[in-house]
Amino acid sequence: MPEEILRTVADGICTVTLNRPEKRNALNSAMVESLHATFTWAAQQEDIRVVVVQGAGATFCAGLDLRELATQREAGAVETHGLEEALETLEACPHPTIAAVQGDAIAGGCELALHCDLRVGSDTARFAMPLARLGIAVPIALTWKLVDTIGAAPTKELLFTGEAVGAEAALTLGLLNRVVATADLQRVVTDLACVVARNAPLSVRAMKAFVQRLGEERRRLRRDDLEALFRQVRESADAREGLAAQRERRRPVFRGA
């Protein structure tokens, strides 16, 4: 069985590849655990200057493996995937991070891309957060990330509708830094990573820390009530119905409970 998370390092650039193309790189628990370990390892390597995150095949990442998630919930394991912890590790990485987004970046895949410092997309790139269609809520940390990146009104439209945003619209909103032809994506990302890697690492790391600290200061607020609301939605009957409907390929019937 092939490894589902690949890691290579060359010329100071660490490339992390989601390698489950037959499942559109949907993240199962083992992949999330491996991502967490990989990002932790990369953060500790002084010879790494840049981290690139990409997906094998035509899709960046379709989000969490919903079949696995539904099975876990049926077994009473409400939250075992650890994606938020893995993304926190990615965001805390002192090295600049770049997402190479080809095709869909859906739900957890959108989160993964947004937790990278820079995002380069192919002309096939699409971003979507269709969690309301599953009866679940977006993690609070991602809500902040979206508002910081694209503003409150576009965030509300993205979350309320669950509709996908194409590459050019994503560029306009700020979800992407650049859009290139699919055939050029790998070359452009490599060139960008090399430009960053050639700069003074202490300088780049310091400036990344400056930008992140400013964002953290804006987020300092009481959020106990928001965490409680997130748990309420996550554990609701609607959330169970949404996942069941997805698995059974039918339209969900939400009752607001």
Which role does the model predict for each range below?
Residues 88-202, 235-236, 240, 244, ...:
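Crotonase-fold acyl-CoA enzyme core
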Residues 158, 210-214, 228-234:
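Helix-loop "lid/cap" segments that line or gate small-molecule binding pockets
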Residues 33, 55-89, 105, 133-135, ...:
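Glycine- (often His-adjacent) and acidic-residue-rich active-site loop
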Residues 1-3, 244-257:
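Terminal low-complexity tails and localization/encapsulation signals of metabolic enzymes
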Residues 30, 34, 82, 89, ...:
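Charged catalytic carboxylate motif
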Residues 16, 20, 35, 53, ...:
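Terminal peptide-recognition signature
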